[in-house]
């Protein structure tokens, strides 16, 4: 029997002899009530136990948006247009907004990768940078002795917005 499996951004074709195949487990298809864009807008209009972002931020504040790097499937490029609109409604200016890709111990992105992650509009309007372990501000030490060092663009922001997704991770 021939099968196609998603692998990276492509497809891996494999053949398994019928005698070696016990069965195939497939996920059930779940119908979405809203499109991705509609869901992002709903989340911004109906925040859980919070004011709307436009009601929290103030004109002139520096805003850091922290998001995942290329190793995670967070659809940052799909979220950013609505998020930027929300921030602008609250009085934020593009020159005061920085999108920070939290790379942790991973390699830095290329400009092309950062642009793809941010999306064309965000890339054109705001500053998009990788976190930098060599440019951190030391905020202190935990009770367990662990140093707390935060990348400068995030530490110096007046407001920090963290984007992320929930996924199985091992």
Short names for language-model regions:
Residues 86, 90-100, 105:
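Hydrophobic or amphipathic alpha-helical targeting/insertion segments
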Residues 109-170:
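An acidic, phosphate/nucleotide-engaging active-site surface
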Residues 14, 23-25, 74-75, 162-163, ...:
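Short helix/loop capping segments that flank catalytic or ligand/cofactor-binding pockets
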Residues 73-92:
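Histidine-anchored nucleotide/phosphate-binding helix
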Residues 48-64, 89-94:
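Glycine-rich phosphate/diphosphate-binding loops that line cofactor/substrate pockets in enzymes
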Residues 48-51, 82-86, 143-153:
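Short alpha-helical segments and helix-capping/turn motifs at coil-helix boundaries
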Residues 62-73, 98-104, 162:
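Short glycine-rich or small-residue beta-strand-to-loop segments that form or flank ligand, phosphate
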Residues 1-43:
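N-terminal amphipathic/basic leader segments beginning at the initiator methionine
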């Amino acid at each position: 029997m021939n099968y196609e499996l998603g692998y990276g951004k492509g497809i891996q074709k494999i053949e398994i002899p019928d005698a070696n195949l016990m069965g195939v487990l497939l996920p059930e298809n779940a119908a979405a009530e809203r499109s991705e864009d509609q869901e992002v807008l709903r989340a911004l209009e109906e925040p859980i136990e919070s004011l709307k972002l436009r009601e929290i931020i103030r004109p002139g504040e520096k805003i850091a948006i922290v998001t995942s790097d290329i190793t995670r499937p967070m659809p940052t490029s799909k979220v950013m247009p609505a998020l930027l609109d929300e921030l602008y409604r609250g009085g934020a200016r593009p020159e005061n907004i920085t999108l920070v890709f939290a790379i942790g111990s991973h390699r830095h992105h290329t400009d092309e990768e950062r642009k793809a992650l941010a999306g064309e509009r965000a890339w054109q309007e705001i500053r998009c940078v990788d976190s930098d372990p060599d440019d951190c501000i030391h905020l202190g030490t935990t009770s367990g002795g662990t140093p707390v060092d935060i990348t400068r663009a995030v530490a110096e922001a007046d407001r920090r917005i963290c984007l992320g997704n929930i996924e199985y991770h091992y």
